[in-house]
């Protein structure tokens, strides 16, 4: 967490930024936005073998209850407004993980007229997880990278 000092009688000193970011990294609640086969790997990551609950990651069904959106799969033009609407309904601070080649840049369907060539054209993306489909380990690594990114951010304006 970044303990700055330990005082007598069991007191610990740290900054408010470090304390808030430590709490945020321990309770990431992702909104699952599974669009294709990558969603199966996302479910695999939440199952007993990898158990994302031990990292404080609890999948939520509502955007108002979540602070992370995992976009997994091919984003088509008809689904893009719905993706943006769900993103806008999430509370601040919010983060987006783009999972798979299709979500990152269109993937196999890149040249199709109906496919958005990357969900970063619709919502700002914080972490890209490559693969077709990416493994559960890759998603887990992406979540750990997001936790590292959150730890480095400043919460309180100076």
Swiss-Prot record:
Pfam families: Oxidored_q6 (PF01058). One of its GO terms (cellular component) is respiratory chain complex I. Its EC number is 7.1.1.-. The keyword 4Fe-4S applies. Its cofactor is [4Fe-4S] cluster. GO terms for biological process: aerobic respiration; electron transport coupled proton transport. [4Fe-4S] cluster binds at residues 37-38, 102, 132. GO terms for molecular function: 4 iron, 4 sulfur cluster binding; iron ion binding; NADH dehydrogenase (ubiquinone) activity; NADH:ubiquinone reductase (non-electrogenic) activity; quinone binding. NDH-1 shuttles electrons from NADH, via FMN and iron-sulfur (Fe-S) centers, to quinones in the respiratory chain. The immediate electron acceptor for the enzyme in this species is believed to be ubiquinone. Couples the redox reaction to proton translocation (for every two electrons transferred, four hydrogen ions are translocated across the cytoplasmic membrane), and thus conserves the redox energy in a proton gradient. This is NADH-quinone oxidoreductase subunit B. It comes from Thioalkalivibrio sulfidiphilus (strain HL-EbGR7). The gene is nuoB.
